């Protein structure tokens, strides 16, 4: 049985690609047709690719590996954080800071600062320091949590990367490839699939599409950790795909054009 159904994909708008004038020819094999200037992704291939990505991440998790979830575009930020936390994994959902993977020794010093500030507050140091200094320290803490909070417990390199939109996350992908870390990615019709080891051809602009697919990847990790079946994970998550309407394709894609 497939990890995800065609009905789920359709209701989440996963099949809507980018405008035909904004495409990468390497994605041709994942395109079903064109409609009103928008490429329609072949969901039969998406179902198959989701299965492949799911099984890979499940195996990574079974082997005790960790996955770094990356999605810094507005449509992905909430899902990336929520699903990574649900699965007990690492995440980056704000700006990717150069060296998170390739220069982690330096980045880890900044991560360590988070705990240092927390200990300062616990020990009552904020009560004796000048108020202005405390305000600045708290601002520093908020910045660190915003950009590095999702990797504060990452003591070693992740065994896999999951990204939403390879174009947006090209710096993260470049670092992962340099370190030979396998990459799973939601890849829209304007992206280069060659950069991704496990391609999930899908709409990377609709919030519901991103949420659905990111949730499935988190399920894979949980199944690997706990040895539970797909059905048990789905029942526990109790996803109701009918609670929101699919975002208008034209509006979503035009917003993406402006942001890029």
From Swiss-Prot:
One of its GO terms (cellular component) is cytosolic small ribosomal subunit. The keyword Iron does not apply. GO terms for biological process: translation. Pfam families: Ribosomal_S2. Keywords: Ribonucleoprotein, Ribosomal protein. GO terms for molecular function: structural constituent of ribosome. NCBIfam families: rpsB_bact (TIGR01011). Belongs to the universal ribosomal protein uS2 family. This is Small ribosomal subunit protein uS2. It comes from Staphylococcus carnosus (strain TM300).
């Amino acid at each position: 049985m497939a990890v995800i159904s065609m009905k789920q994909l359709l209701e989440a708008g996963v099949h809507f690609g980018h405008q035909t004038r904004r495409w990468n020819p390497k994605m041709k094999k994942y395109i079903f047709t064109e409609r009103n200037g928008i490429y329609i992704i072949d969901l039969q291939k998406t179902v198959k690719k989701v299965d492949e990505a799911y099984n890979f991440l499940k195996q990574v998790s079974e082997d005790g590996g960790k996955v770094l979830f990356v999605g810094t575009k507005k449509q992905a930020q909430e899902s990336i954080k929520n699903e990574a936390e649900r699965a007990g994994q690492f995440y980056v959902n704000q700006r990717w800071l150069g060296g998170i993977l390739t220069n982690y020794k330096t980045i880890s010093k900044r991560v360590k600062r988070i705990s240092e500030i927390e200990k300062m507050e616990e020990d009552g140091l904020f009560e004796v320091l000048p108020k202005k200094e405390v305000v600045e320290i708290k601002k520093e803490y908020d910045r660190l949590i915003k950009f590095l909070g999702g990797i504060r417990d990452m003591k070693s390199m992740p065994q896999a990367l999951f990204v939403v939109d390879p174009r947006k996350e090209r710096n993260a992908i470049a670092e992962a490839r340099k370190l030979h870390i396998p990459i799973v990615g939601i890849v829209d019709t304007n992206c280069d699939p060659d950069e991704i080891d496990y391609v999930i051809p899908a709409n990377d602009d609709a919030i519901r599409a991103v949420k659905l697919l990111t949730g499935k990847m988190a399920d894979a990790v949980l199944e690997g950790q706990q040895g539970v079946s797909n059905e048990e994970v789905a029942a526990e998550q109790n996803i109701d795909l009918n609670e929101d309407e699919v975002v208008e394709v034209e509006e979503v894609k035009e917003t993406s054009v402006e942001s890029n």
